C-alpha cells in the first residue's frame, strides 16, 4: 500500500538525522563550555583589577619574556619589588593571570594556610614526575599529609647527629682535591661542579649508606642524577617540548627515560636488599646490627622502611623510592647553590671571612683531627649569621608556586580569587627595601638576636614556611656549617676577576659557572 511506503522512513535519513542531532548536541555542549569559561574568565579579570600590573609586552604575550632567566631579569625582579612593594599582577600570554607577592604580610595567608587551601602549582613541576613520583615535593592532599608525618622522624636530631661525621668525610675529600689542584697551579675553581659532587657524595652515604667514591672517580648513578637535572632545565626552556608525546620522541626525551630507569633501578635494588635484611633479621636484630656497624647510624632508607602510620601501615616500595629520589634531588642542587654563593659572598667581604675563620680557629683550637662535631654546630654564631645573610641575598630557590583552591583574603582586604596561581617571590621578599634596608648590601648583623626580633618570621624564607616548609632544612644547615667552617679553616677564599652573572633555573646558578680562587692556608698561618 502506498501509505505504508511513505510512512516507512528511509533508514539513511534516520541515521543522518540522528548524526545531525548528535553534532548539534556536541556543538551546543562545546558552546556552553566556551561561554561558561568566558564568563568565568571575565569575572576573574574583574576581580583582579584591584591589583596593579606593569605594562604588558603586547595583548598576546602579556608579560612573557619580560623577565628573562639572566642577570638582567634578576635586576628587573628587584626593580619590580621596589615599585610594587606587596603584590602585583602578571600575565602569561593572554589568558593566564599570575599574582606575584613580595611582602611578608601578604604571603602569610598563603604560607600559613592548610596545605589543601594553597597547594603547590604543578604546571612547571610535572616534568619531575617521572623521576620523583609522588614524593613530598610533588604530592598533595592526604598522601602528602601521611608522608609528611611518616618522614618527620627521619629528620630528628638523633638521626641527624651521626650525619655530621659523613659531612666531614665528604668535605675532606673535596679539600684534598682542591689542595692538589692548587699545588698544580689551578687555584681558580668552579664552585657548583665541585660542591655538587660533594653534596651528592654525602647524600648517597646518608640516604643509602653507600660510598660511591663519586668525587674521585665517575659514578653511573651520580652521572644519571646530574643528567636528569640538566635535562629538566633544558626542557623547561623549550615550550614546544612541554608536551610529553613530543618530548619522549626526541633524543633528550630518550636520554631522560634511560637516566630515570638507571636511578630507579639503583634505588629499587637498595630497597629490596634492606627489606630482605629486615625480614630475615627482624626489627630488633636489624636495629642492633645498625648500632654495631661502622657508621652506627640508620640510613634514610632504613627509617622509611621502619616507618608505620597510626594504622600500622608501612610505606610501599614505590613510596620509599619516590621519597629517596626526592631527597637526592632536593638535597644536592639546593645545598650546592647555597654553599657556592656563601663562599662567593665571603670572598667579596674578607673582613667577615676573617671573623668567621677566627671563630672556627677558636672552636677547634688544639683539636686533632680538625673535625666539626655535632655540639660545635651551635657554637658558630657569626658564621651562621653569614650563612643566613647569603641565603637572603642569594636564595637557592627564588620562587614558590601556589594555586588557591579557595578565595584568599589579604591583610588590606583585597581578595585573591579561587583558582589563581600565586608566585611567592622568595627573592622579591629578601630584596624588598620595605623589609630589608639597603637590601643589596651583604650585612650579617641583620641576623643578630636584636635585629631578628624586629622582623616578621616570613621576611626570611629560604626554606619556605608553614605546613609545606622544607623538611630537610636542619640537615641542609648542618651540612652548610660543616662545609663553610672547614673550608675557611683550610683556605682563603678570593673573588675571581670576573663578576658572576646570576642565572635562575630550578635553583639559582651563575652563567658559565661560579668561579673563585682558593689559597691554601698553612698550619703556621692557623
UniProtKB/Swiss-Prot annotation:
Single GO cellular component term: endoplasmic reticulum membrane
Output the PROSITE patterns linked to this UniProt entry: CYTOCHROME_P450
Write the Enzyme Commission number(s) for this entry. 1.14.14.1
Q: Could you tell me which InterPro entries the record lists for this protein?
A: Cyt_P450, Cyt_P450_CS, Cyt_P450_E_grp-IV, Cyt_P450_sf, Cytochrome_P450_Monoox
Taxonomically, the superkingdom here is: Eukaryota
Q: What UniProt keywords are attached to this protein's entry?
A: Endoplasmic reticulum, Heme, Iron, Membrane, Metal-binding, Microsome, Monooxygenase, Oxidoreductase
Q: What class of enzyme is it?
A: oxidoreductase
Membrane topology recorded in Swiss-Prot or TrEMBL: Peripheral membrane protein
Q: In which tissues is it expressed?
A: High expression in liver and kidney. Lower expression in brain.
The listed locations are: Endoplasmic reticulum membrane; Microsome membrane
**Which SUPFAM superfamilies does the UniProt entry name for this protein?**
Cytochrome P450
Which reactions are catalysed by this chain?
an organic molecule + reduced [NADPH--hemoprotein reductase] + O2 = an alcohol + oxidized [NADPH--hemoprotein reductase] + H2O + H(+)
- In which residues is heme bound? 470
Needed co-factor(s) = heme
One GO biological process this protein is involved in is: response to 3-methylcholanthrene
Citing just one GO molecular function, the answer is: iron ion binding
Q: Which family does it belong to?
A: Belongs to the cytochrome P450 family.
Q: State the name under which the record lists this protein.
A: Cytochrome P450 4F5
Gene from which the chain derives: Cyp4f5
